[in-house]
Amino acid sequence: MASKWNWSGTKGRRTPRRPYGRPYKSSVPTTRVVVHQSAVLKKDEVVGTEIKPEGDVARYKMKKVMLTCTLRMAPGELVNYLIVKCNSPISSWSAAFTSPALLVKESCQDMITIIAKGKVESTGVAGTDCTKSFNRFIKLGAGITQTQHLYVVLYTSVALKAVLEHRVYVEV
């Protein structure tokens, strides 16, 4: 007869997949931190911002990030974006990334890892601004600790206003 106790000596949860006594790995408690930023981006410029939990969180591990960006721009314009992981802080965006395509330059290829990429193109009637947005849910595998850095990098073909919100799922 199977026991209903797991290895730590406490009774396990019953789930449809594990109805009785198999041990299960208890999940680490996570917390969600929401960060809201807005900026005016210049034409033909590579800019970026760091994605990290705000506040007095000293030690953490980010497991996943939900990223939402809303852009207000003229029709026919383009915004490229990258989500990158880096072991050291990036001081100059134009020194690390090429301008229209957002490729990592050769001098920085050993320290920057591309996690996700995409583009936003606007359509509409000339003379009016349109609002576009994108949502990305990024799973970070083993996670990003407080010593590593996660950035979203943007290239815009026109000056525009961007509102960036991200929800960080943190294991504390």
UniProtKB/Swiss-Prot annotation:
Compartments, as annotated in UniProt: Virion
Ranges for region Disordered: 1-26
Keywords: Capsid protein, T=1 icosahedral capsid protein, Virion
Transmembrane segments: none
InterPro entries in alphabetical order: Nanovirus_coat
Ranges of Basic residues composition bias in the record: 11-20
Xref: Pfam families: Nanovirus_coat (PF04660)
Gene Ontology terms: cellular component: T=1 icosahedral viral capsid
Family: Belongs to the nanoviridae capsid protein family.
Protein name: Capsid protein
Native organism: Faba bean necrotic yellows virus (isolate Syrian SV292-88) (FBNYV)
